């Protein structure tokens, strides 16, 4: 555990100068956190924590990953946002993530709505929802991808490296629709 107060950490990460300098905003700053095991001294300051997370983020986005993000025409934060959707869409069968990522990229490229249940659940802030209903789709939120086209403003969770890489290595196919099996065992 860190001694520094969580409000202090929050303040450092949403500092307008830091956000602007590093191409983040308050919606997508969560993408600076790359899942890994990090060691910190208990008395690490908020400033040093932010500096370390930015260093890890920049290290993670190596030339190969940067080139792949460019190839699919997404910023790093957009990759993280899409990866968070893929993560929540398929959190059991990781081998299906590149296919799901490809499907969402196809929708983006065709200027379609993503119509992602996980983003709607995030918008509703009701994480007990197992099945999205038509009444749920009426919520007015930029995270309602049934209502608005394109990616939501930021990630809906901190995506795993596996999900980020699934987006960067998305399957090349023409799929734009999927249907989950009734028992949620796959698509």
Which ranges hold each PLM region?
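Bacterial extracytoplasmic/cell-wall-associated proteins, especially those involved in peptidoglycan
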Residues: 4-187
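Extracytoplasmic/periplasmic/luminal assembly and interaction segments
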Residues: 1
């Amino acid at each position: 555990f860190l001694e520094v107060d969580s409000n202090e950490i929050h303040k450092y990460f949403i500092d307008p100068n830091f956000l602007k300098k590093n191409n983040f905003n308050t919606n997508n700053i969560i993408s600076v956190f790359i899942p890994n095991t990090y060691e910190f001294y208990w008395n690490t300051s908020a400033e040093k924590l932010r500096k370390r997370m930015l260093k890890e983020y920049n290290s993670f986005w190596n030339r190969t990953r940067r080139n792949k993000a460019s190839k699919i025409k997404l910023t790093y934060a957009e990759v993280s946002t899409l990866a968070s959707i893929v993560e929540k869409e398929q959190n059991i069968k990781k081998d299906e993530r590149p296919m799901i990522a490809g499907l969402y990229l196809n929708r983006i490229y065709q200027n379609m709505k993503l119509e992602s249940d996980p983003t709607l659940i995030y918008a509703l802030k009701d994480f007990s929802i197992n099945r999205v209903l038509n009444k749920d789709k009426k919520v007015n939120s930029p995270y309602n991808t049934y209502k608005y086209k394109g990616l939501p403003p930021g990630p809906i969770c901190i995506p795993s490296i596996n999900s980020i890489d699934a987006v960067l290595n998305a399957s090349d196919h023409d799929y734009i629709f999927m249907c989950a099996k009734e028992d949620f065992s796959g698509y």
